[in-house]
Amino acid sequence: MANTTFNGAVRSENGFKTVSKNATTGVYTDKAVMNSSGNLYTTAGGHLQYAAATGYGPSDLVIGKGGSQYGTANPWAESSTQLFPLGTKLIYGNNVYRYGLLGGTAVTAGKLVQHQAQDSDHLNMTATAAVSAGETDISVETGGTDLTLNEYADGYLWVNDVNGEGQTMRVKSNPAHDHSSDPSVVITTYDALVTALTTSSQLSLIHNPYSGMVIAPATETGAVMGATVIDMTADYYGWFTVSGPQALLTVGTLVLGNIAVRSGGTDGGVAPATDNVLTEIGEVMAVNANTEYSLIWMNIQ
């Protein structure tokens, strides 16, 4: 029944299986089983992949270490090549990870990372023409700084003021852009505008938050996106903890069961919560000394 197409419902009293056949031995191996109770079992985790079609962006979920046929989902490994869409979520045991790209500076294990700082030339840009509701191509005039091809792909374009303000769209693509030649550039989004724009509308851009991440500086320049699991090489791809137990650099004296926050004094570290309004990272599970690594139940997503 290989490659058989059915028109209508398919029923089975005892469930379904997907199998693979060894070309040499002819032995069949179960890859996934849905039993008669509707429970789904896979031999090595699973990968729910939303195939990117016109108008839709990738939204991948991997369940289980190694649970993907497209690449090994291993939080304790890094690679120079991209294996998954940036932002892919991995659930493994009690932990949740996000797949990302580190920026141009290496970061050791157990450090908080944030998204790359926004380019001020791509903030408060004006629309160069009115854009009707239902459109996905939006022309803006930048304040400077050239754009490389698809630099903002899977980042965000939002209307920050005047007509259409409050709308946030995921970026699908942008062309290479030389500001000295033409200050305007067309940004294409996955989803269409709901409220029309005018030439008075102001818009801003930010990169994919999981692209080009940096150690979270003591003086904040963005939001915390996760924590390094291993010593990571500059410009390499890997997994970053966002939820569950993670050893993090300790700054000061943490208290069991209390909240740990982003450190305002040491890059990449966590500190006890004080009156300062800093990002809550999670709850303290086990305390180690200042400059050592305490176990934190992270909960940033």
Regions found by a protein language model. Give the residues of each.
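A short, compositionally biased
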Residues: 35-36, 149-153
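Extracellular receptor-binding modules and their adjoining Ser/Thr/Gly/Asp/Asn-rich linkers
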Residues: 52-149, 161-301
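Short conserved beta-strand and strand-loop elements enriched in small hydrophobics
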Residues: 154-161
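Intrinsic low-complexity, repeat-rich intrinsically disordered segments enriched
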Residues: 1-62, 271-275
